[in-house]
């Protein structure tokens, strides 16, 4: 049965509206037919009438019909057709982006759009169990990302470090003595209700996670018992009663990862308990082993996570951005096929990005910048909505094609262009450490064996060539594109990087030529070890870029590293990260000469795991930015040969 709702309302030209236009829509709709017209928004009398038509079916939408919509913008009206309010909400987000401003005038771009999500789960997780984040910050993220059609917020509420959900039945769970970090910082039951309602207003599903039976030292501190014990299970059921009574949500996530199961009845009993209360249950995989019908959804983590027929799966396997660098991993994330399929179905639900705060970071906004949260989320927003992708993370990995006519390169470059537009127009007050990288070109040498002598010099330090002869062997150079390049990925050969078979105890060199139309002061983002936000790694020694003895020269002058704010020698997750990562420190201030400039990087590596750094990342980040680090430097040309 069809019915019609005629709405006449007038869009205000305000900071909450995305002025993008068809050319900058993000995520890109499935199908756009532009009519080449713009319809002026001049006054309340002339703004278009918006007609919302609720229909029983949209035959043009092949999957996830509940979230699909048809949107048509013409001179006299804007027509939205959808099956549910969800589709109407997403249509409105697209409509906001179709509003274009020119001076003090506003226009709608005329078009017809057929749109729907390829995957029904498109989300992010905040690990507030380890590091508390305010309700205001969570709301800001949810509201902002819902404009880009992110529809799931995974709330990891409990951890060893703290139980962040208020318990009226067991207040000692929230006592300072039960915490290992940020004591007594938790969400009241009223705040949880408020956040659930806020998510619903923004078309976002909130999934609370009560991690069990592992990651539960806070529980054990409060009660002096193991969750898997008879007494522990009885207490846990009462705590779950509070969750069910106060959080009006369909799903409860129960964790079950990284734990030895001493009680084989624990997980089945907890799943049954929640199901009997009308909740669907999600569990990590790897974790407890389920058969179809025994769990409602699994969330895959680590390379060992496997989707199972008959159990809907969420992909988080390579989506832990606490290990991501700012540039190269974004390429892999954008190009990756979610769950290695182009489009979701009953067994393939979608993807959730995770931020794990094993390492303490002071300041909730610093968590976002250290993890390059918003660039990663926009990449996921596009891929999870649009579907497709060229391969999984373990396919082509983090490398951009060097042929700029390659469709994979063109697709990423187009996404980057649109994402950067949104950064400079809509994320101006948000932490967003990204500039375009598809124009940054390098030549990288074959790796020279250094036999463990990281300080050893090799021919590229004397002259830059396309190939070198050294000790009877020829070493070639190869083109690479990107502001961040992995020579060997964080996860080794699991994720392809520049070298196909990287070996320890080798030294590589990378160089580029940069044309500047004038002599100018600019900033330089440079780094040789991206510090994971879930590792205990030690800060670099003062006066050194890293423990690998990496170096950088600009126009034959060696550039010194910043002064490191941390100098501790103790491996501890409770000693905060400071300015180890380039995103949180001011750019290096350098001078570019008029016309051509030369940049040379020395990239040694010893072992791939050391006492100071568990996951040695053989990589570099290097790109010029404005002195304040907010934008790209205009009119620079990167080239792998001097012209």
Show where each model-derived region lies.
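A short beta-strand element within beta-rich, extracytoplasmic domains
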Residues: 518-542
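Beta-strand-rich ligand-recognition modules
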Residues: 537-539, 543-620
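Short beta-strands within extracellular/lumenal beta-sheet-rich domains
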Residues: 502-515, 584-586
């Amino acid at each position: 049965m069809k019915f019609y709702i005629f709405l006449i309302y007038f869009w205000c030209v305000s900071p909450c509206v995305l002025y993008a236009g068809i050319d900058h829509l993000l995520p890109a709709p499935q199908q756009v037919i532009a009519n080449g017209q713009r319809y002026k928004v001049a006054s309340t009398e002339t703004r278009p009438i918006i007609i919302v038509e609720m229909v029983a079916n949209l035959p043009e939408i092949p999957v996830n019909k509940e979230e699909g919509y048809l949107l048509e913008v013409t001179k006299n009206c804007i027509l939205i057709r959808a099956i549910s309010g969800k589709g109407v909400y997403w249509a409105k987000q697209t409509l906001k982006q179709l509003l274009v401003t020119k001076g003090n005038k506003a226009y709608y771009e005329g078009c017809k759009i057929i749109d729907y999500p390829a995957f029904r789960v498109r989300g992010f997780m905040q690990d507030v169990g380890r590091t508390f984040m305010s309700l205001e910050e969570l709301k800001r993220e949810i509201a902002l990302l819902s404009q880009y059609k992110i529809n799931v917020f995974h709330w990891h509420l409990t951890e060893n470090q703290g139980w962040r959900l208020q318990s009226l039945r067991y207040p000692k769970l929230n006592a300072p003595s039960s915490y290992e970090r940020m004591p007594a910082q938790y969400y009241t039951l009223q705040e949880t209700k408020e956040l659930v309602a806020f998510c619903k207003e923004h078309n976002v599903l909130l999934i609370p996670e009560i991690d069990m039976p592992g990651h539960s030292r806070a529980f054990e501190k409060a009660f002096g018992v193991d969750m898997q014990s008879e007494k522990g299970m009885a207490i846990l059921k009462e705590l779950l009663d509070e969750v069910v009574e106060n959080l009006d949500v369909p799903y409860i996530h129960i964790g079950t990862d990284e734990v030895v199961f001493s009680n084989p009845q624990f997980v089945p009993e907890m799943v049954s308990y929640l199901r009997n209360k009308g909740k669907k249950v999600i569990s990590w995989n790897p974790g407890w082993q389920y058969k179809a019908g025994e769990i409602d959804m699994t969330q895959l983590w680590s390379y060992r996570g496997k989707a199972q027929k008959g159990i809907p799966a969420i992909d988080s396997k390579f989506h832990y951005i606490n290990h991501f660098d700012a540039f190269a991993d974004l390429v892999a994330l954008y190009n990756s096929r979610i769950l290695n399929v182009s489009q979701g179905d009953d067994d393939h639900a979608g993807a959730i990005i995770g931020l794990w705060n094993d390492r303490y970071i002071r300041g909730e906004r610093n968590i976002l910048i250290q993890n390059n949260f918003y660039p990663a989320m926009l990449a996921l927003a596009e891929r999870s909505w649009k579907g497709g992708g060229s391969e999984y993370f373990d396919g082509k990995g983090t490398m951009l094609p060097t042929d700029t006519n390659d469709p994979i390169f063109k697709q990423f470059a187009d996404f980057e262009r649109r994402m950067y537009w949104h950064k400079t127009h809509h994320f101006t007050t948000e932490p967003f450490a990204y500039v375009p990288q598809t124009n940054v070109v390098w030549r990288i040498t074959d790796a020279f064996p250094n036999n463990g002598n990281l300080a050893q010099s090799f021919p590229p330090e004397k002259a830059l060539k396309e190939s070198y002869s050294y000790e009877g062997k020829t070493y070639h150079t190869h083109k690479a594109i990107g502001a961040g390049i992995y020579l060997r990925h964080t996860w080794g050969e699991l994720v392809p990087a520049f070298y196909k078979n990287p070996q320890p105890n080798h030294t590589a060199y990378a160089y580029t030529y940069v044309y500047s139309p004038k002599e100018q002061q600019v900033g330089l983002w440079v780094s040789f070890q991206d510090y994971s936000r879930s590792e205990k790694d030690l800060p670099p020694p003062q006066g050194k870029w890293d423990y690998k003895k990496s170096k950088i020269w600009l126009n034959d002058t060696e550039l010194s590293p910043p002064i490191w704010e941390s100098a501790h020698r103790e491996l501890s997750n409770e000693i905060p990260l400071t300015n180890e990562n380039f995103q949180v420190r001011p750019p290096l201030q350098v001078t570019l000469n008029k016309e051509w400039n030369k940049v040379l990087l020395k990239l040694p590596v010893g072992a791939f795991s050391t006492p100071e750094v568990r996951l040695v990342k053989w990589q570099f980040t290097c790109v010029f930015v404005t002195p304040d680090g907010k934008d790209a430097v205009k009119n620079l040309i990167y080239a792998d040969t001097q012209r």
